[in-house]
Amino acid sequence: ILYGTGGENLGGSFYAVLLSDLLLGDISSSIVLDTDQNKGYIAPAAICQNTDNGIYDIIIQSYDGLVSKIDGQNFSTIWTYQKSGTESSAEPVIGNFTGDLTPDVLLVLFNGVAPAYNDYFQVMLDGSDGSVQFIDSMGVINFASANAVDLNNDGRDEGIFSVVYFNNGYFNSKVQSVDFVNDTIITLDQVRTGVNIASTPLINDLDNDGLIDLIYCVKYDSLNPMGVKGINVFRHELNSIIPNAGIAWGSYLGNDYDGAYSTSLTPCW
């Protein structure tokens, strides 16, 4: 079991403990994987299998924006990354963005201190060493965790972000795809009036026709981001087939809602 403590203004740690200990009601044997003295842990971990030893590595992110890759065999830290001045409650997303056999990491970061954010960053890290391979600042609101899927079946995943913009006095939402190979950004469906605060899209093949379906939510209210006037749910079928390697990260907590990335990687050379 992987779990975190703390929060926006309360320091905490991220732990691992045996399920059997939890069932016995005693988690005193918990192992500390990482600690943040200032802001604790809200986002769930993501895990990905190490191609060298078959052990699952663990990607965790504190609310203070500190991202750590932990060796699942001995719980040592492999690398860390932190962009100064940012926070995040978005789950790290795993995909094959750089084309080697080590899964990479996609982040959504909020610039500033809650509740007064002034920018949002979309960041892709090389899974081997945590180095920044891509960073952008799309939109005026982006709290939702990302997705990863290979839309053009070239062996590399695109990053999918649900981003809010502000134009002509009202808010609108776009689901946008970042192609890290060609360095291009496209909008996957029409621009929708309204706001998506923190709902991660679903990427799946609902009708089993071999084409990718995109399902996402947008609030009715286009003037107040926190308004409670209801939501619209949209389904859009893309002109993209299910990729040979399968969908990398199709929903919040991944394809099976367990935080695990299980796509088999093959070299892109």
Predicted regions span which residues?
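Short glycine/acidic-enriched loop and turn motifs that connect beta-strands
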Residues: 6-10, 65, 110-116, 164-169, ...
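A detector of repeated loop/turn-to-beta-strand junctions in beta-rich toroidal repeat architectures
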Residues: 11-13, 55, 64, 117-121, ...
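Aromatic (tryptophan-biased) beta-strands that constitute blades/sheets of beta-rich domains
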Residues: 20-38, 76-84, 126, 131-138, ...
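Beta-propeller blade termini
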Residues: 43-51, 90-98, 143-152, 199-206
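Loop/turn-rich, solvent-exposed surfaces of beta-rich toroidal or solenoidal domains
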Residues: 140-177, 195-203
